[in-house]
């Protein structure tokens, strides 16, 4: 195989509790990740000269600092391959939105290049490499909805319901560093240590601080909250609410479209990236 095109799906944090702060400054979390059937798309073409080249410029992100390029070069170095790749990105997911755009792109890059370069790397090894790029990368590498602990890297598969979501995208980028260093951030939630999604006693501990500091996010939560429970994902800026059908979700988004930007997407416990990879494996073995 010389070329490969794969999706990089969005994720939601259905809830996010901060249960402590480690000596190294990182926060101990409990959260549930679920994927959306909505995301970026990446195309890869094999090179035999070892060059890694991303042909899509991302504003304010230098080429060599892009997580896609960093993931590709790290996999190249760790595997010892002499092959390279040309990479093109169709960017759909917002930066600083809390829906995993950069982490998902990095995970898709690792899985795609392991396939193109015919590396004998299993999911565990790719996820461990992904963790060095970001705490959210492993869940995208593994591709199954998960209850996460630690800094978000200790994953236990779960299967929450898969509703339709309205996701609103406030036109502001939230700084994760700013939120996690904020003095008013809750850092002492009681550990649930529960694998199922808790009913009625879950929340996003980052949400009060983000609402306080980002009025655009507060407005989005208030707008969506008129129709269903609205919640922040990650540190934002995106907010989401669940609906039982696409028709209901589409109707609500249409009603909000005069003042809010967003999209409708289906929740999925198996990422569309992994569904695509599974179909490729079936085709190649047929």
UniProtKB/Swiss-Prot annotation:
Protein function: Catalyzes the phosphorylation of the position 2 hydroxy group of 4-diphosphocytidyl-2C-methyl-D-erythritol.
Active site: 11, 136
Keywords, sorted A to Z: ATP-binding, Isoprene biosynthesis, Kinase, Nucleotide-binding, Transferase
Species, as recorded: Pseudomonas putida (strain ATCC 700007 / DSM 6899 / JCM 31910 / BCRC 17059 / LMG 24140 / F1)
InterPro entries to which the protein is assigned, alphabetical: GHMP_kinase_C_dom (IPR013750), GHMP_kinase_C_sf (IPR036554), GHMP_kinase_N_dom (IPR006204), IspE (IPR004424), Ribosomal_Su5_D2-typ_SF (IPR020568), Ribsml_uS5_D2-typ_fold_subgr (IPR014721)
Top-level EC class as recorded in UniProt: transferase
Gene: ispE
Gene Ontology molecular function: any one: 4-(cytidine 5'-diphospho)-2-C-methyl-D-erythritol kinase activity
Binding-site residues for ATP, renumbered to this chain: 94-104
GO BP field: isopentenyl diphosphate biosynthetic process, methylerythritol 4-phosphate pathway; terpenoid biosynthetic process
Pfam families in alphabetical order: GHMP_kinases_C (PF08544), GHMP_kinases_N (PF00288)
HAMAP family: IspE
Protein name: 4-diphosphocytidyl-2-C-methyl-D-erythritol kinase
Pathway assignment: Isoprenoid biosynthesis; isopentenyl diphosphate biosynthesis via DXP pathway; isopentenyl diphosphate from 1-deoxy-D-xylulose 5-phosphate: step 3/6
Protein family per UniProt: Belongs to the GHMP kinase family. IspE subfamily.
Record-listed E.C. numbers: 2.7.1.148
Reactions catalysed, as given in the entry: 4-CDP-2-C-methyl-D-erythritol + ATP = 4-CDP-2-C-methyl-D-erythritol 2-phosphate + ADP + H(+)
Position of the signal peptide: none
SUPFAM superfamilies: GHMP Kinase, C-terminal domain, Ribosomal protein S5 domain 2-like
């Amino acid at each position: 195989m010389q070329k490969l095109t794969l999706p990089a799906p969005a994720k939601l944090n259905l809830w996010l509790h901060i249960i402590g702060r480690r000596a190294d400054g990182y926060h101990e979390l409990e959260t549930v990740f679920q994927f959306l059937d909505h995301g970026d798309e990446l195309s890869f073409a094999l090179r035999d000269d070892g060059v890694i080249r991303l042909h899509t410029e991302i504003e304010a992100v230098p080429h060599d600092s892009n997580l896609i390029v960093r993931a590709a070069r790290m996999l190249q170095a760790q595997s010892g391959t002499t092959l390279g790749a040309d990479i093109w990105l169709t960017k759909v997911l917002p930066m600083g939105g809390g829906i995993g755009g950069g982490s998902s792109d990095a995970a898709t890059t690792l899985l795609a290049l392991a396939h193109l370069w015919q590396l004998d790397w299993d999911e565990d090894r790719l996820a461990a490499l992904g963790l060095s790029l970001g705490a959210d990368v492993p869940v995208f590498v593994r591709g199954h909805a998960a209850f996460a602990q630690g800094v978000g890297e200790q994953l236990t598969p779960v299967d929450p319901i898969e509703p339709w979501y309205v996701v609103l995208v406030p036109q502001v980028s939230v700084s994760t560093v700013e939120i996690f260093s904020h003095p008013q951030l809750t850092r002492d939630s009681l550990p649930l240590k529960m694998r199922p999604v808790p009913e009625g006693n879950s929340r996003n501990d980052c949400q009060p601080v983000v609402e306080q500091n980002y009025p655009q996010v507060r407005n989005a939560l208030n707008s969506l909250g008129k129709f269903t429970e609205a919640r922040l994902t990650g540190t934002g800026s995106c907010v989401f609410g669940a609906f039982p059908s696409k028709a209901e979700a589409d109707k609500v988004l249409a009603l909000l479209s005069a003042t809010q930007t967003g999209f409708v997407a289906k929740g999925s416990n198996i990422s569309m990236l992994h569904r695509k990879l599974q179909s490729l494996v079936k085709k190649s073995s047929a």
